[in-house]
Regions:
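Conserved short histidine dyad/triad with adjacent acidic residue
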Residues: 51-71, 107
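A short, N-terminal "cap"/entry segment at the start of jelly-roll beta-barrel domains
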Residues: 1-58
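Short, charged beta-turn/beta-strand-edge "cap" motif at the junction between a beta-strand
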Residues: 109-112
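A generic structural motif
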Residues: 86-88, 114
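A short hydrophobic beta-strand segment most commonly corresponding to one strand
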Residues: 104, 117-125
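Short, conserved beta-strand element in jelly-roll/cupin
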Residues: 71-85
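Short acidic-glycine-tyrosine-enriched beta hairpin
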Residues: 90-107
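Short hydrophobic/aromatic-rich beta-strand segments that constitute the beta-sheet cores
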Residues: 69, 85, 121-124
Length: 125
């Protein structure tokens, strides 16, 4: 049975020896600050799973819409959805991300996220 041993709703994150289904974990969405919204009515949700030596691992999700952000040092893997990430740095091309995309962001990078299908990712930051 593939889900055996998985904790369906880890309220306080994961404890050693437990797991969760990252694709179906229920998340609580909140509206983005109006100053960050470029278009639409996007919401985001975050669910920290573990803190490992000062590095946080968790699940983040954004609904369709466009929003600006200032990034933190992070690597993430897209689980579901689609988006385009535009960078303020003219030397960096826009990134189209979809399931399986692995992306590295740096502290202080300014971005604009255009989500066309609710985007869910696992982040390490």
């Amino acid at each position: 049975m593939p889900d055996e041993g998985l904790t369906p709703e880890p309220a306080e994150g994961l404890t050693p020896g437990t797991g969760a289904d990252a694709a179906t974990l229920a998340l609580v969405h909140v509206p983005l600050p109006a100053s960050d919204v470029v278009s639409g009515n996007p919401t985001t949700a975050v669910h920290p799973l573990a803190l490992l030596g000062g590095t946080e691992v968790g699940i983040w999700e954004m609904t369709p819409g466009t929003a600006s952000d200032t990034e933190t040092d992070e690597v993430f893997v897209v689980l579901s959805g689609r988006a385009r990430i535009a960078f303020d740095d003219p030397d960096l091309p826009d990134l189209d991300v979809s399931p399986g995309s692995v992306v590295r962001l740096a502290e202080g990078q300014r971005t604009v996220w255009t989500v066309t299908e609710t985007l869910r990712k696992i982040y390490i930051a």
